[in-house]
């Protein structure tokens, strides 16, 4: 994601190294959110992206993540990863701020997954993600609302800043 957009923006005077650094973190944010959201479904197909060493530090094994009762014990490590995803999303926000204002569609296409990511993190902080019966995702109505807000925000820098900041703050 970041690399594709970076190539477009190099022609607009942006530092390609900085765009690449931020773009990589942008991609990592979205990937980490998906990993953290999909733990039960990944376990069902024999995959786990949470390092065993990190689980062992909590006296846990991968198999413990198959039980929703393990969430309390897993929560500190899980929150640590959510915090890391927020840090990466902050870089995504910095990335968006480097996109020239006249490229509204590009700004919108970047803001949309960032805000969806923050809202997903907000849900993951409250829900037991190890519960296989509950999907952690925002509903279609919220996605439409976010799309409308980002379309307006792309026109007004003050509104864009407030929108991004408020979504970020609610995810913390």
Predicted feature descriptions by range:
Residues 6-29, 36, 40-172:
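Catalytic cores of Mg2+-dependent Asp-rich isoprenoid enzymes
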Residues 1-5:
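Short, small-residue-biased leader/transition segments that mark boundaries at the very start
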